[in-house]
Amino acid sequence: MKASSKAIKLVLDHLKSTGRVLGSVESGNSATISEKTASVNKQQQLQEKKPSVLQYRSYNPYLVKEDFLSILPENLYKKRGQFTNELDFQLMKVRDPKYFQFKDQYYLFFNDYNSLTEYIKLTKHSRINKIRVKMTPLAQPLPTLLTKLQRYSKNLYNAFRSSEQYFEGLNEKVDVSGEFTTNQLRSILDSVEEIENKSVLVWNIPTKLRSHDILNYFWFYNIRSSFKIYWDDEMKRNLRFISFENSHDAYRFKRNYHGLLAKELLTLSEKGDAADYSLEMDDSKILIEHLSE
């Protein structure tokens, strides 16, 4: 009994002094822990390198998030407005960061690679507007992609404020540094959506109409800013950015003037300037894109 008690005491003393069970090998144990830690780190690095963004190419500029939700099995028998988003992805319509033109593609941002692959699997044989869905994981590094998103967001914000702020900000450096979280991405997309709801792009407004003419002519719309972001004087073509104080006016503006002949747009004053304008007008149509559509 005494021998047994003595043996137990020796084991406890050894455990207390070394922190290891008697007979264990320290180097081997440390090596095992190091290997496990290295394995976990490697898995994390591989996960970070895997894509979390899907690219969908389409010439249709009017697709919305509900179109991509509708093809999930969980929503097949639900009405619009009742769709769920268990994979929790965010949709972005890809636009040129300088001129804001739609670039025939959409990005679906997922929280991780597993959610991305699950979406591909669930929608493999689906169709959007009778067109077979084919999505491609985006190989572009996420920081590079997010830098482009930041550039578009910043230029759009500046254009919404004023023409001066837009042109001054075109050459400003944009960089995504540090950890970029899902919440930050949501915040950027939400702010972009809010501005897009209140903004339109207009092709072919008569070149003689200056910004203050636009404000006077369309006095019954609550216009915030209006300026040309692209122009070709020789071809008498221009692209104008117009922002409104509310989304309703932006929607009404497109509905009322999209497709109108440029020469029909002007209601000239009684001062007799028709001859001056007639040389500048042609049969081109006013083309308007509401950025939220």
Curated annotation (Swiss-Prot):
It is a peripheral membrane protein. It comes from the Eukaryota. It is found in: Mitochondrion inner membrane. Keywords: Activator, Membrane, Mitochondrion, Mitochondrion inner membrane, mRNA processing, RNA-binding, Translation regulation. GO terms for cellular component: mitochondrial inner membrane; mitochondrial matrix; mitochondrion. One of its GO terms (biological process) is Group I intron splicing. The keyword Ribosomal protein does not apply. GO terms for molecular function: mRNA 5'-UTR binding; pre-mRNA intronic binding; translation regulator activity. SMART domains: RRM_1. Coiled coil: none annotated. InterPro entries: RBD_domain_sf, RRM_dom_euk. Activator of specific mitochondrial mRNAs. PET54 is involved in the excision of intron aI5-beta from pre-mRNA for cytochrome c oxidase I (COX1) and plays a role in promoting the translation of COX3. Present with 799 molecules/cell in log phase SD medium. This is Protein PET54.
